[in-house]
Swiss-Prot record:
Organism in which the protein naturally occurs: Petunia hybrida
GO molecular function: hydrolase activity, acting on ester bonds
Pfam families in the record: Abhydrolase_6
Sequence similarity: Belongs to the AB hydrolase superfamily.
Name of the gene encoding the protein in the UniProt record: DAD2
Presence of the UniProt keyword Cell division in the record: no
Enzyme Commission number, as recorded: 3.1.-.-
Active-site residues (renumbered): S96, D217, H246
Protein known as: Probable strigolactone esterase DAD2
Keywords for the protein's UniProt record, in alphabetical order: Hydrolase
Assembly and binders: Interacts with MAX2A in a strigolactone-dependent manner.
Physiological role: Involved in strigolactone signaling pathway. May function downstream of strigolactone synthesis, as a component of hormone signaling or as an enzyme that participates in the conversion of strigolactones to the bioactive form. Can hydrolyze the synthetic strigolactone analog GR24 in vitro.
SUPFAM superfamilies noted in UniProt: alpha/beta-Hydrolases
Main enzyme class: hydrolase
GO biological process: secondary shoot formation; strigolactone biosynthetic process
C-alpha cells in the first residue's frame, strides 16, 4: 500500500484509560457502527478502532482480490495494527466476521489478548450432518445470486432481516454502510465468509472468551453459541442477550454497552 496500513484502514485511538480495548466491526459495517457504544468506554479505556479493508469507508483500491481470499490476511492486518501501536495486551470485541478474526489472531498471538468478546460469532454458516449453522448451500447461493442481480434490492431486503428488531434508524444505518461498499467487494467477501469453516481451530483458543448471542439472530442461530461454548479451548461464558437481531450495537447500544462493561470487568 502506498500509504501506511494504519492510514489506509482509518485507525483511531481514543479515550484516556490505561487498559486497551479494541472494537472490530463486522461484515457490512465500518467503525462508525460503534459510535453509540463508544462513550461508555472512553473514561476507562484507550479504545482502538479501525475499518476492515473491505469496508466502504476504505479506498477500494486497497482491496486485493488475490490476497483477501481467506480470513488470514485480515488477521495479519489486525496484528500489524496492534504491533504498530505498540500494544502488548488488549481486550478485543469482535462483531460477526471480526469475532472469527479475533479468534484466529488469539491462536497466533495469545499473549496479546486478555479476553475476547464475540458478538454474533459463527465458525461456519453452512449446515452439516451434526452441525446447525443456519444455512443450506442452496440458500447461500440464492443470496449470492440476489446480490449479483440487483445489489440495491438485496440491501433493502437484507438490512431489515439482519437488524431483526423494529428499529428503523438501525436499518437505515446498516443500509448506509452496505451501500458504501462496492458491490463486487461485498460479494467477494460474502463468499469468503459464508464458505469458511473455523470449527477445526476452536480448540486451539486458550484466551478467555465471552460469547454474546442475541435472540432471533437471522444469521447465527442460538445453537451456534452453544457449539462455540462446547468447542472453544479456553474458559468461556455465553451471554444470552434479550435483544433481537445480528447488530445489537446498532439496535440496542445502551443495553449492549452495559453487557460489555460487565464482561470486561469479569475476572
Amino acid at each position: 500500500m502506498g500509504q501506511t496500513l494504519l492510514d489506509a484502514l482509518n485507525v483511531r485511538v481514543v479515550g484516556s484509560g490505561e487498559r486497551v480495548l479494541v472494537l472490530a466491526h463486522g461484515f457490512g459495517t465500518d467503525q462508525s457502527a460503534w459510535n453509540r457504544i463508544l462513550p461508555f468506554f472512553l473514561r476507562d479505556y484507550r479504545v482502538v478502532l479501525y475499518d476492515l479493508v473491505c469496508a466502504g469507508s476504505v479506498n477500494p483500491d486497497f482491496f486485493d482480490f488475490r490476497r483477501y481470499t481467506t480470513l488470514d490476511p485480515y488477521v495479519d492486518d489486525l496484528l500489524h495494527i496492534l504491533d504498530a501501536l505498540g500494544i502488548d495486551c488488549c481486550a478485543y470485541v469482535g462483531h460477526s466476521v471480526s469475532a472469527m478474526i479475533g479468534i484466529l489472531a488469539s491462536i497466533r498471538r495469545p499473549e496479546l489478548f486478555s479476553k475476547l468478546i464475540l458478538i454474533g460469532a459463527s465458525p461456519r454458516f453452512l449446515n452439516d450432518e451434526d452441525y446447525h449453522g443456519g444455512f443450506e448451500q442452496g440458500e447461500i447461493e440464492k443470496v449470492f445470486s440476489a446480490m449479483e442481480a440487483n445489489y440495491e434490492a438485496w440491501v433493502n431486503g437484507f438490512a431489515p432481516l439482519a437488524v431483526g428488531a423494529d428499529v428503523p434508524a438501525a436499518v437505515r444505518e446498516f443500509s448506509r454502510t452496505l451501500f458504501n461498499m462496492r458491490p463486487d467487494i461485498t460479494l467477494f467477501v460474502s463468499r469468503t465468509v459464508f464458505n469458511s469453516d473455523m470449527r477445526g481451530v476452536l480448540g486451539l483458543v486458550k484466551v478467555p472468551c465471552h460469547i454474546f448471542q442475541t435472540a432471533r439472530d437471522h444469521s447465527v442461530p442460538a445453537s451456534v453459541a452453544t457449539y462455540l461454548k462446547n468447542h472453544l479451548g479456553g474458559k468461556n461464558t455465553v451471554h444470552w442477550l434479550n435483544i433481537e437481531g445480528h447488530l445489537p450495537h446498532l439496535s440496542a447500544p445502551t443495553l449492549l454497552a452495559q453487557e460489555l462493561r460487565r464482561a470486561l470487568s469479569h475476572r
